[in-house]
Amino acid sequence: MSYENVLFRSFRGIVFISITPFILLTASLWFSSDETAFILAHVSQVYFSILLFFLAGIIWGMRASLIKEQTELLLIAFVPILIATIGGISSFYINPAWGVGFLLLTIYGIRHVKVINNQINKLEQPYVVLIDKISIILCICLMVILTYWLNPYTNPIEVYY
């Protein structure tokens, strides 16, 4: 087994372990009482924002090893921080549906930004595939949270009006 294969497998394991609580929190929204689901929706959004802050730290740390792309990586490192901050502010000051909707649209759309896409495509193919899989999983989880907030039967968003 080559060194790159071991490195990729450990990286993949770390990534899947780190998003597992987010998946479990999101899935538990539909199997819990309304009062508990209200708290779980907020906790899952906070956990997602923490994941974005960790992602920013990882990108920030990559700057040291990639001298040529330091300025691009510096700008890219601020993107997850900005996304998490704006999502949190809009959830707090407007309502959680706006915050989660913003997170969903930006996470889905960020992959189509040319600077970020060029940096991702410089990675080896297994890493690009892993990033695509994780992006899809995170978008599905964010859609589940958004549908919880917009559920017309329990109407949890009415607390904010």
Placement of each model-derived feature along the sequence:
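Interfacial loop-to-transmembrane junctions
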Residues: V113-I140
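Alpha-helical transmembrane segments and their membrane-interface exit regions
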Residues: I50-L51, L103-I116
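Helix-adjacent hinge/juxtasegments
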Residues: I59-S90
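Cytoplasmic-side transmembrane-helix entry/capping segments in multi-pass membrane proteins
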Residues: R12-V15, K68-V79, V100-L103, P126-I136
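Short juxtamembrane and helix-loop transition motifs at transmembrane-helix boundaries
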Residues: Y3-V6, S33-A41, A56-E69, I116-L123
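The first (N-terminal) embedded transmembrane alpha-helix
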Residues: R9-W30, I136-L142
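Transmembrane helix-loop-helix
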Residues: S90-Y108
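Juxtamembrane boundary at the C-terminal end of a transmembrane helix
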Residues: V144-Y161
